[in-house]
């Protein structure tokens, strides 16, 4: 009589999250071992220093072999060499593509080229992030940009599909790609108070409203490129400040609506025309690439700084922008309402986000 025996062999790849973090942060094996010793792991586990060294080296070898798969995350899902549960695969991918706020602020809006990569030594010194980690993050930005730059469809969806990132991280990468493509200036001294989150918020609004994809979901590069026709049309808004009667009527409508509601009413009334000229002239200049790049510099100079110097609270800024935008619909001589709404709807959201200390 013969009996059959089924044998199952498991070789699940073990991933130590703490060691993975040390590897991602760019620490050498020696430094990683020292940090693990400092954490008290030898006392907790009863292991020897030699075992800890061997364990760390084994993990580093595994991560090094996984790295080429992490460059194209769908490959990690479909390979058979490493037996890694789906939840662990998602963690590996998400953390590999995560980035440091201090690092992204240094490269946001810059061309993702060799020229910028040469600056990584200085960025590493300035931020305290290891050079190896800076390189990984920069290469990730560049890799995502290269994959999605020629694709049709939603930028966020394309990033999620090809890199399997969470919705939040995919949206952050969409902002990075959008800023790199349009080369927005973010490094000037007067912009240093702004966080990556501030810029990412504005990028999302612009992608939704000012790109080719905002008006035609079948357009090539729809979420990467600003709608040039829209930018050209914005010159039509100049009539709001060039026509004295329209400017006076606009001011009158806003002041009538806000009298008694703003703590800074007298400051607003005195500065209305300067603020309006600033906002409208920003729009009219967006036909030039340099002025597109300087958008955030102009918004801070023309609106944020004047209001801040007069000590406007955020609530008053919100009241003003809402009424300033809405009152244009009551100007009988103005015929570009849809264009105005497309411009100010996005600009209002951006300005409210940019208005803080």
UniProtKB/Swiss-Prot annotation:
Bilayer topology: Peripheral membrane protein
Name this polypeptide is given: Acidic fibroblast growth factor intracellular-binding protein
PANTHER family: ACIDIC FIBROBLAST GROWTH FACTOR INTRACELLULAR BINDING PROTEIN (PTHR13223), ACIDIC FIBROBLAST GROWTH FACTOR INTRACELLULAR-BINDING PROTEIN (PTHR13223:SF2)
Record carries keyword Nucleus: yes
Function: May be involved in mitogenic function of FGF1. May mediate with IER2 FGF-signaling in the establishment of laterality in the embryo.
Residues where N-acetylthreonine is found: 2
Residues passing through the membrane, by range: none
Organism: Chlorocebus aethiops
Pfam families xrefs: FIBP
Keywords, alphabetical: Acetylation, Membrane, Nucleus
Cellular-component GO terms for this entry: endomembrane system; membrane; nucleus
Designated gene of the protein: FIBP
Lineage: Eukaryota, Metazoa, Chordata, Craniata, Vertebrata
Record text on subunit structure and interactions: Binds to internalized FGF1; this interaction is increased in the presence of CSNKB, suggesting a possible cooperative interaction between CSNKB and FIBP in binding to FGF1.
Protein's GO biological process: platelet aggregation
Localization of this protein: Nucleus; Endomembrane system
GO molecular function ontology, one term from the record: fibroblast growth factor binding
């Amino acid at each position: 009589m013969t009996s059959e025996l089924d044998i199952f062999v498991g070789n699940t790849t073990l991933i130590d999250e703490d060691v993975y973090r040390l590897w991602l942060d760019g620490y050498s094996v020696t430094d990683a071992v020292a940090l693990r010793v400092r954490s008290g792991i030898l006392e907790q586990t009863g292991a020897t220093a030699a075992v800890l060294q061997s364990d760390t080296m084994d993990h580093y070898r595994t991560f090094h072999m996984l790295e080429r798969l992490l460059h194209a995350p769908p490959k990690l899902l479909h390979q058979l060499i490493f037996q890694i549960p789906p939840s662990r695969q998602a963690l590996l991918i998400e953390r590999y593509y995560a980035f440091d706020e201090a690092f992204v602020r240094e490269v946001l809006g810059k061309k993702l080229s060799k020229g910028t990569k040469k600056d990584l030594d200085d960025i590493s010194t300035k931020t305290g992030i290891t050079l190896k980690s800076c390189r990984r993050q920069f290469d990730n930005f560049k890799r995502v940009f290269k994959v999605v730059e020629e694709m049709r469809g939603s930028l966020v969806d394309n990033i999620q599909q090809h890199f399997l990132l969470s919705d939040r991280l995919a949206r952050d990468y969409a902002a990075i790609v959008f800023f790199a493509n349009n080369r927005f200036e973010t490094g000037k001294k007067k912009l240093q108070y702004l966080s990556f989150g501030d810029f990412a918020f504005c990028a999302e609004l612009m992608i939704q409203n000012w790109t080719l994809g905002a008006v035609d979901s079948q357009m090539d590069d729809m979420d990467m490129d600003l709608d040039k026709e829209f930018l050209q049309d914005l010159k039509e808004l100049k009539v709001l400040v060039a026509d004295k009667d329209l400017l006076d009527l606009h001011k009158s409508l806003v002041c009538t609506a806000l009298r008694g509601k703003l703590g800074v009413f007298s400051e607003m009334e005195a500065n209305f025309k300067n603020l309006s000229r600033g906002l409208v002239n920003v729009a009219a200049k967006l036909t030039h690439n340099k002025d597109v790049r300087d958008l955030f510099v102009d918004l801070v100079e023309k609106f944020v700084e004047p209001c801040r110097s007069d000590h406007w609270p955020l609530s008053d800024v919100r009241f003003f922008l809402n009424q300033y935008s809405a009152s244009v619909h009551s100007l009988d001589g103005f015929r570009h309402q849809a264009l105005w709404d497309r411009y100010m709807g996005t600009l209002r959201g951006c300005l409210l986000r940019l208005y803080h200390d």
